């Protein structure tokens, strides 16, 4: 009977390869943790116009050698959806780099639902994408970053599903982060703060569609904005209060989104950095920026971080330090 249980355990384990390798994330011995954000790959499997997206992802991963890769939506833009999703995510998995995905508004328009895509992602090694029962959205998950000695949580990454299009009659445009998602964030933020003796843990958030505050910040002449802004943020018309909750909880350092292909800026707003990734896709959809990625480097025990844009040929643009580069110097 014991032998039968062992064999059954091995068989079941092999049927779930996506669950076999979910490494814990931790700061390295130098107290650093590097994240690469790819956004809006808009990959169409077999389409030559997508070749440059594969080239750039490969180049950035080989150059930066990140500890984590986050894909912030619109990974695929055509059928076959499964082959497209696997092709992109395997670029990280084949290098044994942990990765996570937050869906965009186009991912589930290619013949598969969000749930079906989520199930596919779960079968890919090194995947950290998860979901929370009872919370709206398919890709809501938390990635704690352990201290370099592995003994405690040192920072927190919140990944959220920003949904697709408005579901309210008479309200056009894009959907907003729902109240139960905000409650989920607040409850977990409070939990981590309590575990840390009452001090909020440094946190970052990643999702696809920008918050309304992006437009508010970018149009304020007193706010410091670094990078390219060639289009207004296509944010929800309604504001559900996610940014206000981030301020109340006191843990959030930066928010990183995609969706608007001609933006890659970072703007300092009320103490939080509101940033875009860099469009990563090819010519399968509109774009006026050469493709690349955003890189974020956190330091253990610090409420500051570095971020930059990585482009073709190893070029780096817009390297900044948060918050020091966004605070106006007194005369």
Question: Where are the model-predicted features located?
Answer:
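His/acidic metal-ligating clusters that form di-metal
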Residues: 64-67, 156, 171-264
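Acidic/histidine-rich helix-loop elements
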Residues: 36-54, 75-83, 109, 126, ...
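Active-site environment of divalent metal-dependent phosphoester hydrolases
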Residues: 44-46, 77-82, 101-112, 165-168, ...
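Beta-strand-turn-beta hairpins that frame and shape the catalytic cleft
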Residues: 24-35, 138-159, 267-274
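N-terminal active-site segment of His-dependent metallophosphoesterases
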Residues: 19-88
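Extended active-site neighborhood of metal-dependent phosphoesterases/phosphodiesterases
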Residues: 86-198, 294-299
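Bacterial Sec-dependent N-terminal signal peptides
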Residues: 1-21
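Binuclear metal-dependent phosphoesterase catalytic core
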Residues: 38, 142-146, 242-249, 263-331
């Amino acid at each position: 009977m014991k032998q039968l249980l062992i064999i059954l355990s091995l068989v079941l384990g092999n049927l779930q390869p996506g669950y076999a390798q979910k490494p814990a994330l931790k700061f390295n011995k130098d107290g650093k943790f590097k994240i690469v954000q790819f956004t809006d790959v808009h990959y169409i499997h077999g389409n030559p116009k997508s070749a440059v997206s594969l080239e750039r992802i490969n180049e950035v991963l080989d150059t930066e050698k990140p500890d984590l890769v986050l894909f912030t939506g619109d990974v695929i833009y055509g059928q076959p959806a499964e082959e497209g999703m696997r092709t992109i995510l395997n670029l990280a998995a084949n290098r044994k780099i942990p990765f996570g995905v937050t869906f965009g508004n186009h991912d589930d328009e290619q013949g598969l639902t969000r749930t079906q895509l989520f199930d596919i992602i779960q079968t890919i090694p090194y995947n950290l994408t998860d979901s929370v029962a009872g919370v709206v959205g398919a890709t809501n998950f938390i990635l704690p970053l352990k201290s370099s000695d592995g003994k405690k949580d040192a920072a927190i990454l919140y990944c959220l599903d920003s949904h697709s299009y408005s579901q309210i009659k008479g309200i056009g445009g894009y959907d907003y982060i729902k109240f139960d998602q905000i409650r989920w964030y607040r409850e977990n933020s409070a939990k981590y703060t309590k575990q840390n003796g009452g001090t909020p843990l440094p946190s970052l958030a990643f999702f696809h569609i920008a918050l309304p505050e992006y437009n508010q910040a970018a149009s304020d002449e007193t706010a410091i904005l670094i990078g390219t802004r060639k289009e207004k943020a296509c944010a929800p018309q309604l504001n559900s209060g996610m940014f206000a909750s981030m301020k109340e909880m006191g843990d959030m350092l930066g928010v990183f989104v995609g969706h608007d292909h001609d933006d890659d800026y970072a703007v300092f707003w009320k103490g939080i950095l509101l940033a875009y990734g860099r469009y990563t896709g090819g010519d399968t959809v509109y774009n006026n920026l050469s493709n690349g990625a955003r890189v974020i480097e956190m330091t253990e025990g610090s409420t500051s971080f570095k971020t930059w844009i990585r482009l073709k040929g190893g070029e780096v643009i817009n390297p900044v330090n948060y918050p020091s580069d966004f605070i106006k110097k007194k005369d």
